[in-house]
Amino acid sequence: PAGIDQRSPARHPDWLGPDDLALKIEEIREATDGQIPIQLKLGAARVYDDVRMAAKTGCDSIYIDGMEGGTGAGPLLATEETGVPGIAAIRQARRAIDDVGMTGRISLIYAGGIRNGGDVAKAVALGADAVAIGHSAMMALNCNRDTPEADYEGEMGVKAGECYHCHTGRCTVGVATQDPEL
C-alpha cells in the first residue's frame, strides 16, 4: 500500500526455521497431490549452511540466486553490494547437497548474472543441474528500452532504462503486462 515500506527480501510468515519449512512443504505437497515440484529459492549468503538445511526439507530443487542477479524490489544497496558471487555459490551449494546425501534427488538450479553460453557452461561445470536466465532474457525482449510515447520521469518517476515497474502491470514496452494497449 502507498506509504508502507516494502520488505525486501520478504520473509514468509508461516515458517521461521527448517522444521516449519519442512511442514509447509508437506502442506503444499498435500494440497497439490504431489503433482507440482516444490522449489526453494535462496539468495547466496550463507550458501553451504542454507542449502544443507534446505536439502533436508523435502523440496524437489534448490534455486540459488547469486548477487549478480537483478530485482526491482530491493534497495540499490542490497541489489548491488550484498550477497555471494554466483560462481562461488555453486560449488558450496553442490557440496552441501552432496554432504546430506541428496545428490540425484534434489536439483541445483543457479541464476544470477547468466548472460551467455559461457556462463551456462561454467555453472554446469561447477555443479549446477540447470540455470535460469532472468534479467538477460528481459533485456533481449527490449525491457527498459526508451519509448518515445513514454514520459518515464513524469509517469513512472524514473529515467528510461531504470523502470522496474514489472509488478504494476504498467510495463510501457509490453514485456511485463497483460494490458493489450501496452
Please tell me what each predicted stretch does:
Residues 1-3:
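Flexible glycine-/small-residue-enriched beta->alpha junction loops
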